From Swiss-Prot:
This is Large ribosomal subunit protein uL29y. The gene is RPL35B. GO terms for biological process: maturation of LSU-rRNA from tricistronic rRNA transcript (SSU-rRNA, 5.8S rRNA, LSU-rRNA); translation. Keywords: Ribonucleoprotein, Ribosomal protein. The lineage of its organism: Eukaryota, Viridiplantae, Streptophyta, Embryophyta, Tracheophyta. GO terms for molecular function: mRNA binding; structural constituent of ribosome. PANTHER family: 60S RIBOSOMAL PROTEIN L35, LARGE RIBOSOMAL SUBUNIT PROTEIN UL29W-RELATED. Gene3D superfamilies: 1.10.287.310, 6.10.250.3450. The keyword Ribonucleoprotein applies.
Length: 123
């Protein structure tokens, strides 16, 4: 079986993809048996192609699942951890802009009673 194009896989339904995955896995099992029994060299070189095809199908399946989850959680308040943006640990623990801008009562009073003086230079 020749290698398949990924754009063709993306157009298929989930049932078609799982069926194709089963076909590839069955073919891989046959090729491995042929390898053990000393099969033709062209079959041995085909193992790599089939393994890559299996990887492609699995990748497309997982990408479809993830995009469906993204759509499901689009307007929700909280997201699952794997759908959140990947940032460094320090950035994730940083205060939010709102939290950083909050001031204590004492700070508010001090700013109210002693505002920053503004000077105009006379020329």
């Amino acid at each position: 079986m020749a290698r398949i194009k990924v754009h063709e896989l993306r157009e298929k339904s989930k049932a078609d993809l799982s069926g194709q995955l089963k076909e590839f896995k069955a073919e891989l099992a046959l090729l491995r048996v042929a390898k053990v029994t000393g099969g033709a060299p062209n079959k041995l070189s085909k193992i790599k192609v089939v393994r890559k095809s299996i990887a492609q199908v699995l990748t497309v399946i997982s990408q479809k699942q993830k995009s469906a989850l993204r759509e499901a959680y689009k307007n929700k308040k909280l997201l699952p951890l794997d759908l959140r943006p990947k940032k460094t640990r320090a950035i994730r623990r940083r205060l939010t802009k709102h939290q950083a801008s909050l001031k204590t009562e004492r700070e508010k009073k001090k700013e109210m009673y002693f505002p920053i003086r503004k000077y105009a230079i006379k020329v």
